[in-house]
Curated annotation (Swiss-Prot):
Residues 1-20 have a biased composition (Gly residues). The lineage of its organism: Eukaryota, Metazoa, Chordata, Craniata, Vertebrata. It comes from Taeniopygia guttata. Residues 1-36 are annotated as: Disordered. The keyword RNA-binding does not apply. May be involved as a ribosomal RNA processing factor in ribosome biogenesis. Binds to DNA. It is found in: Nucleus, Nucleolus; Cytoplasm, Cytoskeleton, Spindle; Cytoplasm. InterPro entries: PIN4, PPIase_dom_sf, PPIase_PpiC. This is Peptidyl-prolyl cis-trans isomerase NIMA-interacting 4. The keyword Isomerase applies.
Length: 128
């Protein structure tokens, strides 16, 4: 039973040039089924850009989130562990594309991600 066409399953030959370490996500980004996410949510693009400027000037993500985020759960923007399928499309795509980073050296979405809720600046603190 050979697989039809190209692309296909996880066991395909040639692959993406990496050794297949099963279980854990490969490399610092992509893969995994859950991410530990922080975000800053602003309804207005201008406010999201103000928050972005604060981040770029070196202010801590959690402080900027507390000051700017309009999310009801204002715990420094911490959303905790989120699984695939539990987030709106553009947010999920961005979250799973980001590398894991820390508060000291955050890697976040620039420009902010637009969803039906507003504009999100997203950072990922963990992946599993």
């Amino acid at each position: 039973m050979a697989p039809k066409g190209k692309g296909g399953g996880k066991a395909g030959k040639g692959g993406d040039g990496g050794s297949s370490s099963e279980g854990k996500a490969q490399g610092p980004k992509g893969g995994g089924s859950a991410v530990k996410v922080r975000h800053i949510l602003c309804e207005k693009h201008g406010r999201a850009m103000e928050a972005m400027e604060k981040l770029k000037s070196g202010q801590r993500f959690s402080e900027v989130a507390a000051q700017y985020s309009e999310d009801k759960a204002r715990q420094g923007g911490d959303l905790g562990w989120m699984t695939r399928g539990s987030m709106v499309g553009p947010f999920q795509e961005a979250a799973f594309a980001l590398p894991v980073s820390s508060m000291d050296k955050p890697v976040y979405t620039d420009p902010p991600v637009k969803t039906k809720f507003g504009y999100h600046i997203i950072m990922v603190e963990g992946r599993k």
